[in-house]
Amino acid sequence: MTTQVLKRKAFIFFLVAPAFLVLIGVVVYPFIFNIIISLSNMSLAHIRDWHFVGLKQYVNVFTEESKPNFYSVFLKTIIWTVVNLIFHVVLGVFLALLLNQKEIRGKAIFRTILVLPWAVPQLIVALTWRGMFNYEYGSINLMLTHWFGLPAVQWLKSPFETFVAVIITNVWLGYPFMMIIALGALQSIPHELYEAAEMDGASWFHKLKNITIPLIRPVMVPAITLGTIWTFNNLNIVWLVSNAGEPSDQTHLLVSFVYKAAFNFYRYGYGAALSMIIFLILLVFSLTFMRKTRATEAAY
């Protein structure tokens, strides 16, 4: 290997090294430290004299009979993720199909308006929707009572209504991402394919089934995977709209359950163990989903 090649490789390493150092500092080190904490009894009472306890914290996650427990929170997290993803994908693809029509004028204006929910910070979105769900003065109840003659709903007083309110908020917040991804995929489909299908007498449904969906799938599958991870780990909306899992801690997701265990009850070892379980759940899901849907295959 010549001196010139060595210098070139050293220069490349010199350029890449800062990024690697930042990656190690903000990702690798915290991840390894979290694993270490999950194997310890670290808590507020043992913040300095903590020691390793093996897998005890992991066992506690699955065996503690607290209310809510891991299983009820996990089930609610699955329901939350599935319902949100269904609405995100269906609404996003539907709106993308509308915006992709040539007959629609002012597409740029509509696109900007529809993207706004995703552009607004989650803190503002959560607090705005929380105000809209207010029992006495919220705009949601005002519309229900004045426009439709329905009784006002106590959105944030019972577990079911609060959970529905949180889902509505996150659906409004999350559909623009899927819409933008789907719109980009639709615009990359050659128009000649639709023209050939029309010449063969294909209906709108057959074009959607045999051309549109197969060709946007390689783009949508990674987007759905990302959306699943983001929704599964969404702390801000649940925490702010439901006021930290209220009422009676019945609207917790796994991620808010971790936050409360670690930073409200100061059970750092328990929270770290639960966060590692969440990581493993999402890792297994992502690898399985990407493999089963063949996301890396070319569309055409």
Predicted regions, residues:
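A structural signal for multi-pass alpha-helical bundles of membrane permease subunits
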Residues: 4-300
